[in-house]
Regions:
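A positional/architectural concept
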Residues: 1-68, 74-77
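Loop/turn positions that initiate beta-strands
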Residues: 84-86
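Conserved beta-strand segments that form the floor/walls of ligand-binding pockets within enzyme
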Residues: 70, 88-90
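Tryptophan-centered motif/residue detector
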Residues: 23-25, 68, 120, 131-134
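Surface-exposed, charge/polar-rich loops and edge strands
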Residues: 90-122, 130-133, 141-152, 156-183
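Basic- and aromatic-enriched surface patches that contact anionic nucleotides/nucleic acids
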Residues: 126
Length: 183
């Protein structure tokens, strides 16, 4: 585990995802030695640099105890990097997790449930991020709708944490880095 102020230096290769076809983003998988220095096996927000350009992002769990990172087109262009290149990273876990972006459908549901909204407003940013992650990780629209309803009911009852899901993907094998496009 690392202290919030410790800078993690490493290198990783930029990969093009196999799906969706024609994706504008790339990704990289952190070396395990770098991931092990992070404070958690699940999502963790960091600041730092990629190829010398500033970055603020949330690393995603790769389901193997490590992490992966999306590199959006704007950062690719600013850094002058492309798929296949190895880039230097300098990452520092943030001292306080940023507020997550609430999906529109969840936002509407919370607005319609004052008791759920009251609990939502009282929980930490990490807890809100976990609820959002649980809701959006459903593969089907029907599952997502059920999870929104369940989340609102649980929040309204005072439940502060989404439970019963593996935040790292290591045990459930439900999370993974994208599959790289074949060369």
């Amino acid at each position: 585990m690392t202290q919030a102020s410790a800078i993690i230096h490493c290198k990783a290769t930029l990969l093009e995802p196999a799906m969706p076809a024609g994706a504008s983003w790339l990704f990289l998988v952190l070396p395990m030695a770098a991931s092990y220095r992070l404070p958690t096996r699940s999502m963790v927000s960091v600041t730092g640099t990629v190829a010398g350009h500033p970055l603020q992002a949330t690393l995603q769990p790769d389901g193997r105890g490590g992490h992966w990172l999306t590199i959006e087109r704007a950062l690719q262009q600013a850094a002058g990097v492309c798929a296949g290149q190895t880039v230097a990273l300098a990452l520092t876990p943030v001292a306080e997790e940023p507020e997550p972006l609430v999906p529109d459908d969840l936002h509407v549901a919370l607005a319609a449930h004052p008791a759920a909204r009251a609990t939502w407003d009282d929980i930490t940013a990490v807890a809100r991020r976990d609820w959002i992650f649980w809701v959006v990780s459903g593969k089907k629209a029907q599952t997502r709708g059920k999870r929104i309803a369940t989340a609102c009911a649980m929040l309204a009852s005072g439940k502060r944490r989404a439970c019963c899901f593996d935040r790292s993907g290591k045990y459930s094998h439900a999370l993974a880095a994208p599959t790289p496009k074949a060369g």
